[in-house]
Amino acid sequence: MNTVDYLRISLIDRCNFRCQYCMPEGAEIDYILKQDLLTDNELLSLLKEVFIPVGFTRFRLTGGEPLLRPNVIGLIEAIASFPETKDLSMTTNGFLLSKMAKDLYKAGLRRINISLDTLDSDTFNLIIGNKNRSHWQLVWNGIQAAYEVGFDPLKINVVIIPGVNDHEVLDLAALTINRNWHIRFIEFMPIGNDKLFDNKGWISSEELRQIIRKKWGLTESFVPGNGPADIFQIPGAKGTLGFISQMSECFCDRCNRMRLSADGWLRPCLLNEIGQIDLKSSLRNGISVEELRQQVEYLLGLKPEINFKQRESGTTGIYSRTMSQIGG
């Protein structure tokens, strides 16, 4: 089992998109009330006094859409300023990125992942649940802005959904040929979207690799990061292709992370809901940070068993939260 030193932090559960695989249409989303979110001070206190002392040094800010969080720049500055912080990154839908890229970089953010599942504006609107003016160009502009500012590596997350965007695999992969971008194909997961998943199913990473390999060939490669992606490269390309295969290829033995939701629940495994700790309520009820630290240490010890023994029940069970509420 890997050393667990990577914490994914959901700053907010709200998002200005409603992507099919994250916040499915028709699903009732009970948004967290403002007073139930971890405050800036609570989050920073947990990081400084609980997570860093037990070995967490790498942090990723997620959502919902993290750029909707008030004072997100200030939070980034504070987390980046911790001497123990080795890596600070973010996953965003890119909608606000063209306006904020420079400030994010200046605050100390150095790596960024941007979600873009299609190069077609109509398909984009379908995926994000948008019935008004297309936002595709704004996201594309955000990607360009992040690249120009200097985020490196710049990664683009792609979820392939059968019958929706699976015809674009080669076009998306081709973005890496002349650009130092890193496209990551993520297998579609049944978390909070059972109806869509049952209707559409999913495409394995190996199937995607075969499509790309037939066109250009593929060689193994490497790109810095904390994730479980298997990295490949089109021969001669500037960028790389990553494949995250949580459905088809168990990588529990490589898991190095936990997830902290916007309302303070610490989740040891994405694939099931066993072992979660409500850190926010404990903190507000006067439980000392020393005791919380002990609880997190204990959960770290249980994580291998949770990962492996509960994997099957997790991928077939009922989830009480959508991906947006978990933090991805």
UniProtKB/Swiss-Prot annotation:
Catalysed reaction(s) here are: GTP + AH2 + S-adenosyl-L-methionine = (8S)-3',8-cyclo-7,8-dihydroguanosine 5'-triphosphate + 5'-deoxyadenosine + L-methionine + A + H(+)
The record, for InterPro entries, names:
Aldolase_TIM, Elp3/MiaA/NifB-like_rSAM, MoaA, MoaA_NifB_PqqE_Fe-S-bd_CS, MoaA_twitch, MoCo_biosynth_MoaA/MoaC, rSAM
| Cleavable signal peptide | none
Q: What class of enzyme is it?
A: lyase
Binding-site residues, GTP: 8, 60, 91, 155, 257-259
Instruction: Specify whether Lyase is a keyword of the entry.
Output: yes
Q: Does the keyword Nucleotidyltransferase apply?
A: no
Q: Which domain of life is it from?
A: Bacteria
Residues that coordinate or bind [4Fe-4S] cluster 1? 15, 19, 22
Q: Where does [4Fe-4S] cluster 2 bind?
A: 252, 255, 269
Name of the featured protein: GTP 3',8-cyclase
Q: In which pathway does it act?
A: Cofactor biosynthesis; molybdopterin biosynthesis
Assembly and partners are described as: Monomer and homodimer.
Q: Name one GO biological process term.
A: Mo-molybdopterin cofactor biosynthetic process
What organism is recorded for this protein?
Answer: Trichodesmium erythraeum (strain IMS101)
Q: Explain how, and how many, cofactor molecules are bound.
A: Binds 2 [4Fe-4S] clusters. Binds 1 [4Fe-4S] cluster coordinated with 3 cysteines and an exchangeable S-adenosyl-L-methionine and 1 [4Fe-4S] cluster coordinated with 3 cysteines and the GTP-derived substrate.
Cofactor requirement: [4Fe-4S] cluster
Record's function text: Catalyzes the cyclization of GTP to (8S)-3',8-cyclo-7,8-dihydroguanosine 5'-triphosphate.
Gene this protein is translated from? moaA
Quote the EC number: 4.1.99.22
Similarity field:
Belongs to the radical SAM superfamily. MoaA family.
